[in-house]
Amino acid sequence: MRVLGLMSGTSADGVDAVLAEFSGSPSEPKWSLLNLVCIPYPEDLRQTVVNAGQGIKLNSCEWLELSESITEVHAQAALACDPRAQAELVGSHGQTVWHRPPQKNHRGASWQILQAPLLAELLKRPVVHDFRAADLALGGQGAPLVPMADAALLGRVGGWRGVLNLGGIANLTLIPPRSGPDRLASVMGWDCGPANSLIDLAVEQISKGKLAFDHDGIIAASGHPHTTTIERWLKETFFQLPPPKSTGREQFGLADLEQRLKELPKMSRANRVATLTAFSAAVVAQDLDNLHLRNLVRPLELIVAGGGSRNPVLMNELRQRCRGMRLLNSDELGLSAEAREGLAFALLAWWHCLQYPGNAPAITGAKRAAVLGVRADPA
């Protein structure tokens, strides 16, 4: 089956559209990537999405117009990726505007904004959306959902295999080896903390809105990270939590950035960006070290995807902190860094069609596995 996958992550820079074909066993599918298109959000829309994700109030009309605009960009990306309408099905994550993990006093909740019936009508094809709701209803975190797709798409090797996505948030997948005593272990995955979210916001402030991110890590490369501050930040509660755990821009957004910058008052702008960049690498490295202490698991290789994989300073910080692991860009395995999450949600939509569970209780904390997504058909 040919499926379109549409993804817009916490970086809120636009929509990645993937056209893929799946066949065979759902747990070990044969797949091919047929096309990839990335459509950026117009700047005013991007800024509204970022603001909404940080709790800045919108009135009812603004929320309505935001959901409509997001849906229209998703449709634009889908049509650009699949102009001949080859796909039979569309899987769309929507745009996360708020994510609240479960706490002792309330259930978890997550909102991915999208007008799915409108998208289905614009594309004249069924759309599977709202992928997180079933896991949340079962007491799970609702995230991350990509690890099971990672395991199915990338497969197993002779040892543990790590997959790291560096979007707005850094999230990890650990795939068990194909042989040996750990071959029966479960796939693991969780959110580590900020990847690009704080860096991007800092660069936008520094450039007075002229830059949306640190292109090629140029700003960070001209500065020096403050290691004592990073070590102090790593002791914060979230970074000490064991999995399952998930987070988003609502936790690591503008308010968090401003608090951290207050702790760096006499530092140059370049040093601030360098510190935030090194911090993003450090939260991942610390989680991998803690994984080894808890589970005696250390991946042989770490496959890196997402926009942060294009930042050479961030990648070098990871190499320095994750010694003993081979770092690979997902491009080296034939999977574009920009395609990974769109491909994952195309797979989740295919799984929905097959009524195959897409979550893993060991990862999200849900009571049981469940078929994910809600289907909207053209009117």
From Swiss-Prot:
Annotated catalysed reactions: 1,6-anhydro-N-acetyl-beta-muramate + ATP + H2O = N-acetyl-D-muramate 6-phosphate + ADP + H(+)
GO BP field: 1,6-anhydro-N-acetyl-beta-muramic acid catabolic process; amino sugar metabolic process; peptidoglycan turnover
Listed NCBIfam families: PRK09585.2-5
Function recorded in the entry: Catalyzes the specific phosphorylation of 1,6-anhydro-N-acetylmuramic acid (anhMurNAc) with the simultaneous cleavage of the 1,6-anhydro ring, generating MurNAc-6-P. Is required for the utilization of anhMurNAc either imported from the medium or derived from its own cell wall murein, and thus plays a role in cell wall recycling.
Family membership noted in the UniProt record: Belongs to the anhydro-N-acetylmuramic acid kinase family.
Species name: Prochlorococcus marinus (strain MIT 9313)
Protein name: Anhydro-N-acetylmuramic acid kinase
Residue numbers binding ATP: G9, T10, S11, A12, D13, G14, V15, D16
UniProt keyword annotations, A-Z: ATP-binding, Carbohydrate metabolism, Kinase, Nucleotide-binding, Transferase
Gene3D superfamilies listed in its UniProt record: 3.30.420.40
GO molecular function: ATP binding; kinase activity; phosphotransferase activity, alcohol group as acceptor
Pfam families: AnmK
Domain of life of the organism encoding this protein: Bacteria
Gene (UniProt): anmK
EC number: 2.7.1.170
Known pathway: Amino-sugar metabolism; 1,6-anhydro-N-acetylmuramate degradation; Cell wall biogenesis; peptidoglycan recycling
